[in-house]
């Protein structure tokens, strides 16, 4: 295991329902990456954008080499093949770790999954398969998974994927809510990179914002 190295995987919704939030998503992502460039330790970043299909924007790139995302990278379109994006990313990262030298496997692996709607387009993976994959990686290797959802019951949806209620949160799907998401996720990543426990209150600010501005 390689100490002080963290594998970070972002799975970001770019389906048509994200229309109007492109600038906020791009700005929030870039701000988060800049914060992580300044953090202690090393990090490899993978970014998967999904609609009907998944597009890998970054494949295990050193965080310090990530260039700012632009509107050429992030363009909304299509439906929501969330399960295919999650399953494909877990399969890829898992295989990389499986065949790597033990001393090269990152000390920490963390997934940040963001979606603003229900799964409606996957054809390679179903919720049962993804749940099996996530539960295995959590139990055997200690991987962390955060699930941020809008316009759905995020906790219930995450539970179908094997992600606990303490790692799932509903957010307000607007400019302010999107910006807050990236701030909070960056804080959570920093905790994991420092080997600090990721407490259930990591999502407190998002919870409070959601309840204050129209959530139930």
Give residue ranges: language-model regions:
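Acidic, low-complexity intrinsically disordered regions
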Residues: 1-216
């Amino acid at each position: 295991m390689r100490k002080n190295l963290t594998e970070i995987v972002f799975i970001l919704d770019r389906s048509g329902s994200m229309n109007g939030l492109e600038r906020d998503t791009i700005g929030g992502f870039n701000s988060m990456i800049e914060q992580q460039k300044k953090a202690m330790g090393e990090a490899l970043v993978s970014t998967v954008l999904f609609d009907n299909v998944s597009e890998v924007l970054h494949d295990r790139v050193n965080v310090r080499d990530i260039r700012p995302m632009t509107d050429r990278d992030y363009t909304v379109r299509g439906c929501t093949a969330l399960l295919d994006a999650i399953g494909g990313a877990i399969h890829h990262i898992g295989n990389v770790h499986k065949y790597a030298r033990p001393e090269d496997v990152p000390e920490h692996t963390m997934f940040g999954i963001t979606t603003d709607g229900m799964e409606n387009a996957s054809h390679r993976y179903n919720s049962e398969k993804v749940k099996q994959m996530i539960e295995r990686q959590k139990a055997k290797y200690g991987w962390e998974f955060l699930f941020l959802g809008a316009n759905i019951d995020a906790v219930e949806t995450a539970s179908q994927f094997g992600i606990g209620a303490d790692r799932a949160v509903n957010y307000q799907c607007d400019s302010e809510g999107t910006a807050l998401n990236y701030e909070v996720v960056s804080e959570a990543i920093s905790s994991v990179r420092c080997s600090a426990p990721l407490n259930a209150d990591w999502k407190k600010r998002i919870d409070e914002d959601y309840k204050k501005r129209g959530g139930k």
